Amino acid sequence: MNEQITPVVTAEPDAAELPSDSRSQQVSPGRWVTRVVDVLLLLASLGTILNPEDPAVDDTGYVLTSAAWILFALCYIGIRVSRVRRARRGDQRWPERLAGRRTSYLITLATAVTLLSAGLDIATVEGSDEVQDVIRSFGVIMVLLAWAILHLSYAERYAQLYLNADEPSFSFPETPAPTLLEFVYFSFTVGTTFATSDVEVRSTRARGIVLCHGLLAFVYNTAIISMVVGLLTGN
C-alpha cells in the first residue's frame, strides 16, 4: 500500500510579524534616501532661518543657503510625487514610506518659518542690480516650493492618522481603500479652498489638524498674494 506524502509548505512570515531586527533589514535604499533628503531639508531650513546676515550685506551666503534649500525642496517634492504615482499604480507598500510624525511636524514648522523668512527678504531687499534680482527670484521660488511642501507634508500626516487610528478618521466617497493620492487631494483641497470638499472628517483629532492646516494655509496664501502684488506694483 502506497502512502501519500503530503508536502509541508512553510508560509513566509509577514513583514508585520517579523522581529524588529528583520524589519530594519528590509528598509529599502529608497526609504533611506528619503530620510536623508528630509534631514538635509531641515538643516537647509535652519541655515536659511538662522542666517544672521542681511541678504543685502552678505549676498554670497544668502544665495548659497537659498540654493541648497531649493535643491533639497525639489528633491522632497519629487520623491512625494513619485510615491503618489506608485501608490496610484497599485504599490501596496506606500504606507511604509511615509515620513514619521515628528519628521512631518518638523518639516511643516521649518517650512512655515522659511516662507516667512523668504517673504521678509523679498520685502526688505532694495536695489535693482543683478544680485538683488537673484535674491528676489530665489525668494519667490522658495515661497512657492514651501507652499507645495506644506500641503504634501500635511497629506502624509493625514495618511498616518488614517492608518494608525482604530476607526477611520476620514471617509472618501466610493473609495474603501484610499491611497496616498486621496490624502494629497484632500490636503491641497484644504490648502486652496479652506474646505473639505467631498471628504468626511470623522474624528475630533482629525478636525483639529484640519483646522490648523486651514489657518496656516490662509496665512500662506495671504502672504503669497501680498508678495505678488508687491512685485507687480514695485513696492
Residue ranges and their predicted role:
Residues 52-75, 134-150:
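Alpha-helical transmembrane segments
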Residues 91-110:
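Juxtamembrane helix-capping/reentrant segments at transmembrane boundaries
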Residues 28-55:
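The first (N-terminal) embedded transmembrane alpha-helix
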Residues 111-134, 190-204:
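Alpha-helical transmembrane segments and their membrane-interface junctions
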Residues 79-97, 120-128:
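Membrane-helix interface/capping segments
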Residues 74-88, 152-164:
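Membrane-water interface of transmembrane alpha-helices
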Residues 182-189, 201-235:
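Pore domain of cation channels
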Residues 162-203:
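Membrane-proximal soluble regions of multi-pass membrane proteins
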